[in-house]
C-alpha cells in the first residue's frame, strides 16, 4: 500500500510539473468523451488542409497489450476503459510498474506490446494528392496498417521512417480513415532505458502528385571558407518526383531566404522532365551576399525554398533549414569552426527525459540543450542512437554542435541484450515492405544508416557522423566488422562528404601501439586512415599522445571521456575513495570509474594537446538505467 500511495503522489506531482511547464500528458480515457475527440480531430485536420506537413500527434487511442484484429478498420475501440485517448509522443513503458525481475539497464521497466489507433477524415481536395505518413521514431518493432491494409514495418527503434499511404485513404470530407500501429518491444533490447511505443512525432506530408521528394533537398556551401564576406555560392541539389501516370514538364524554382523569410538570393529556375512515376535530380547554384555565419554564439539560420511549377501553377513549396558554416578537423591543430580553433566541449546524451520517459517532448528537449549551453557545453554526442528531429532543431536554433550517432553495436547483441538491433542488422528488407527510401534486398543497417544521413544532412549543428560504439561487447565473430565499416563509410559518403566519420573505439591503447589484431582498431583505421575521418577514442585519455605519435596523419577526437562518480548535492572531504558510509560519492570531482577519469583530468588531457579536437564527457544529464 505504501508503494502504491507513493506512486500516486509522484504521479500527481509530475502532472502538476508538466502542466506548469507546458508539457502535454496523456489523458485518462474515462475523462474525455470519444465523440469530442473525433470532432476536434476532424476540425483540426480540415483547417490544416493547406499545409504541406501536418502534425499528426493529436487524437490517438492506445491499448497496452496485444489485441486480436486491432489492425482492422471496423475494429471496435470504443471501450474507454481499455482504449485511452492520448497525444503523441508517448512512452508506454514509463507508466508501468517497475519490477526487479526486469533488467537494471532498462531501469527495471517492462516492454511489451502496445496498439495505437487513429480515426480521422480528410477533405475532398486531398483526393489525388501524394500523402505520406512519417514517423520520427517508434520503439521498436513497428507494424503499420491503413484502413486495415498493412503498409509496412520498421525494426530499429530510433530511425525515422515513412510510407506513401495515398492509395489506401478515402478523401471525401466525411468517411473516416483509420491508422492502426502495433509496437512490440521485446526485452532485453537495450543497455539503457529505451522506452516503448511511438515516442517521437508523427506527421502527414501532403503534396501534389508532382513534388519535392522526401528529404530531397541537399544544401552545401562548398566555397564558404574563401567566399565569406562576399558573394557566397549555395549549391542546391533537388530531387523532384512525379507520382502520376503521365509525363510532366515542370520547373524547379529555388530561392534562399533569411530567418524572417526575406529572399536573400535571386531565384534560380531550371526545367525538368518527369516521366510517369519517375524521379529526377537537378543541381542549381545561387549566390548570397555576405551571409551571417552559423556558430555556437550566433546560430544564424537560413532556408532554401524550393517551388515546383507545372506551367504557371505552383504545385509544391518545400523549405529546408540550413546554415552558413564551415568546419575543419586537422591532425595537428584539432577542430575549427568558421576558421577559428575551438575545442569541442561535449557531453554524451541518452534520449530519456527522466520521469517523462523517452517521449520526445519539445519543451523538455529544449530545456536540456539550454541547460547545457548555460554550463559552457558546445556539443552533444547522441549516445548511442539516431537523435530525434526535435533535438536537432533545438541544436540548430540554440547553437549546439552534434556528433550524430546511428548505432551502438552492430551484428551481435551487447551485454546479453538478445533483442537489440542485432536481430535485424544483417537481415534484408522484404519486397512487400513499402518503407520509403528502402530497396527490397537491402540490409536493415544500410536502410537505417541512410535514413539517418538523408534526414540530417542539412542540419548545421551536425559536425560529425558516428556509426558505432564499443563494438567488442558480445561479438563472437568479428571477421566481417572491417567490411561493415567500409560499407557504412561508402553509404554515408554517397550522400554527404562534408563531415568526417568516426566510431567510439574503447581500445585506445591498441591504437597507440598499432595492434591491429583487434578488430576495433581495424574499424577505426578504415575511417581515420589518410586523414579522411576521425580516430574516436573512448576513455584512457593518457593514450592520446601515443596515438598521435603512431599516426601523425590521424585526426583525433575523444568520443567518450571521464565518467566521474558524483552524487548531486553531496560535498564531503572525509570520505574514502569519494564514498561516504551511505554509498554517496562526493561532488568535489575526486572519484571516477576505474576505466575513466575525473572531469578535470579529462579536460586537462583535452586542452594540453592541440591535436585533440575535443571531448564528450559521460554524461550530460542523468539517465534511467
Feature map (PLM): residue ranges:
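Aromatic/acidic polysaccharide-binding cleft in carbohydrate-active enzymes
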Residues: 177, 560-578, 604, 609-625
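Sec-dependent signal peptide cleavage junction
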Residues: 2, 19-35
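Beta-strand-rich binding/interaction modules
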Residues: 146, 230-273, 282-284
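Low-complexity, Pro/Ser/Thr- and charge-rich linker/hinge segments at domain boundaries
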Residues: 38-39, 54, 201-216, 325-340
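Extended carbohydrate-recognition surfaces in non-catalytic/accessory domains of CAZymes
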Residues: 32-134, 189, 195-198, 210, ...
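Active-site mouth of glycoside hydrolases
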Residues: 158-167, 187, 192, 326-534, ...
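Bacterial Sec-dependent N-terminal signal peptides
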Residues: 1-13
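Accessory beta-strand-rich segments of carbohydrate-active enzymes
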Residues: 63-66, 106, 111-215, 220, ...
Amino acid at each position: 500500500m505504501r508503494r502504491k500511495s507513493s506512486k500516486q503522489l509522484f504521479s500527481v506531482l509530475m502532472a502538476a510539473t508538466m502542466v506548469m511547464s507546458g508539457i502535454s500528458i496523456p489523458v485518462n480515457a474515462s475523462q474525455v468523451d470519444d465523440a469530442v475527440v473525433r470532432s476536434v480531430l476532424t476540425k483540426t485536420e480540415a483547417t490544416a488542409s493547406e499545409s504541406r506537413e501536418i502534425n499528426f500527434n493529436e487524437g490517438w487511442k492506445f491499448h497496452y497489450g496485444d489485441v486480436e484484429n486491432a489492425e482492422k478498420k471496423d475494429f471496435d475501440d470504443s471501450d474507454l476503459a481499455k482504449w485511452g485517448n492520448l497525444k503523441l509522443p508517448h512512452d508506454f513503458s514509463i507508466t508501468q510498474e517497475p519490477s526487479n525481475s526486469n533488467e537494471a539497464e532498462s531501469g527495471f521497466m517492462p516492454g511489451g506490446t502496445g496498439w495505437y489507433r487513429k480515426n480521422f477524415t480528410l477533405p475532398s481536395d486531398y483526393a489525388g494528392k501524394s500523402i505520406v505518413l512519417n514517423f520520427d521514431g517508434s520503439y521498436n518493432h513497428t507494424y503499420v496498417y491503413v484502413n486495415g491494409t498493412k503498409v509496412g514495418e520498421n525494426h530499429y527503434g530510433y530511425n525515422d521512417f515513412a510510407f506513401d499511404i495515398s492509395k489506401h485513404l478515402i478523401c471525401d470530407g466525411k468517411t473516416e480513415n483509420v491508422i492502426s500501429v502495433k509496437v512490440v518491444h521485446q526485452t532485453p533490447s537495450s543497455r539503457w532505458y529505451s522506452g516503448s511505443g511511438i515516442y517521437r512525432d508523427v506527421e502527414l506530408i501532403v503534396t501534389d502528385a508532382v513534388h519535392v521528394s522526401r528529404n530531397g533537398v541537399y544544401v552545401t556551401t562548398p566555397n564558404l571558407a574563401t567566399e565569406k564576406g562576399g558573394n557566397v555560392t549555395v549549391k542546391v541539389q533537388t530531387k523532384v518526383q512525379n507520382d502520376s501516370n503521365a509525363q510532366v514538364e515542370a520547373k524547379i524554382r529555388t530561392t534562399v531566404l533569411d530567418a524572417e523569410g526575406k529572399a536573400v538570393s535571386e531565384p534560380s529556375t531550371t526545367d525538368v522532365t518527369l516521366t510517369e512515376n519517375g524521379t529526377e535530380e537537378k543541381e542549381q547554384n545561387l549566390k548570397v551576399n555576405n551571409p551571417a555565419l552559423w556558430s555556437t554564439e550566433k546560430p544564424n539560420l537560413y532556408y532554401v525554398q524550393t517551388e515546383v511549377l507545372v506551367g504557371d501553377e505552383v504545385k509544391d513549396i518545400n523549405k529546408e533549414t540550413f546554415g552558413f558554416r564551415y568546419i575543419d578537423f586537422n591532425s595537428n591543430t584539432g577542430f575549427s569552426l568558421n576558421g577559428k580553433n575551438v575545442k569541442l566541449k561535449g557531453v554524451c546524451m541518452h534520449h530519456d527525459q527522466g520521469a517523462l520517459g523517452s517521449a520526445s517532448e519539445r519543451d523538455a528537449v529544449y530545456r536540456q540543450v539550454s541547460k547545457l549551453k548555460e554550463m559552457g557545453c558546445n556539443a552533444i554526442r547522441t549516445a548511442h542512437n539516431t537523435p530525434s528531429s526535435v533535438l536537432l532543431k533545438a541544436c540548430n536554433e540554440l547553437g549546439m554542435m552534434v556528433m550524430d550517432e546511428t548505432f551502438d553495436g552492430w551484428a551481435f547483441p551487447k551485454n546479453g541484450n538478445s533483442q537489440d538491433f542485432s536481430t535485424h542488422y544483417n537481415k534484408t528488407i522484404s519486397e512487400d515492405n513499402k518503407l520509403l527510401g528502402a530497396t527490397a534486398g537491402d540490409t536493415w543497417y544500410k536502410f537505417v544508416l541512410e535514413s539517418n544521413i538523408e534526414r540530417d544532412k542539412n542540419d548545421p549543428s551536425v559536425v560529425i557522423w558516428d556509426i558505432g560504439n564499443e563494438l567488442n561487447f558480445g561479438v563472437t565473430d568479428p571477421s566481417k566488422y572491417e567490411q561493415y565499416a567500409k560499407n557504412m563509410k561508402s553509404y554515408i559518403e554517397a550522400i554527404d562528404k562534408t563531415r568526417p566519420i568516426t566510431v567510439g573505439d574503447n581500445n585506445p591503447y591498441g591504437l597507440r601501439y598499432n595492434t591491429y589484431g583487434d578488430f576495433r582498431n581495424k574499424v577505426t583505421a578504415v575511417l581515420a586512415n589518410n586523414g579522411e575521418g576521425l580516430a574516436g577514442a573512448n576513455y584512457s585519455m593518457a593514450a592520446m599522445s601515443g596515438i598521435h605519435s603512431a599516426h601523425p596523419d590521424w585526426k583525433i577526437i575523444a568520443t567518450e571521456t571521464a565518467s566521474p562518480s558524483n552524487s548531486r548535492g553531496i560535498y564531503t572531504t572525509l570520505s574514502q575513495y569519494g564514498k561516504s558510509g551511505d554509498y554517496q560519492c562526493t561532488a568535489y570531482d575526486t572519484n571516477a570509474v576505474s576505466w575513466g577519469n575525473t572531469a578535470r583530468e579529462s579536460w586537462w588531457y583535452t586542452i594540453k594537446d592541440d591535436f585533440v579536437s575535443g571531448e564528450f564527457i559521460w554524461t550530460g544529464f542523468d539517465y534511467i538505467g
